Amino acid sequence: AEDCVGRKACTREWYPVCGSDGVTYSNPCNFSAQQEQCDPNITIAHMGEC
């Protein structure tokens, strides 16, 4: 869903990854939370900001 926000215990470390959904995630943990809980079809497009 558009308004879904995946949450799990992630550090605040800034190690950005760019998702295939065009969103910059602050680190791989936050990306995986979104993927697991909201959109299993997203992938990491590349490391770094989108």
Curated annotation (Swiss-Prot):
Keywords: Disulfide bond, Glycoprotein, Protease inhibitor, Serine protease inhibitor. Residues 2-50 form the Kazal-like domain. CDD domains: KAZAL_FS (cd00104). Signal peptide: none annotated. GO terms for molecular function: serine-type endopeptidase inhibitor activity. The keyword Isomerase does not apply. Glycans are attached at residues 30, 41. Disulfide bonds join 10-29, 18-50. The keyword Ligase does not apply. Gene3D superfamilies: 3.30.60.30. PROSITE patterns: KAZAL_2. The record marks 11-12 as: Reactive bond. Serine protease inhibitor. Strongly inhibits human neutrophil elastase and trypsin, also inhibits porcine pancreatic elastase and subtilisin A. Does not inhibit chymotrypsin, plasma kallikrein, pancreatic kallikrein, thrombin or papain. This is Protease inhibitor 2. It comes from Cenchritis muricatus. The lineage of its organism: Eukaryota, Metazoa, Spiralia, Lophotrochozoa, Mollusca.
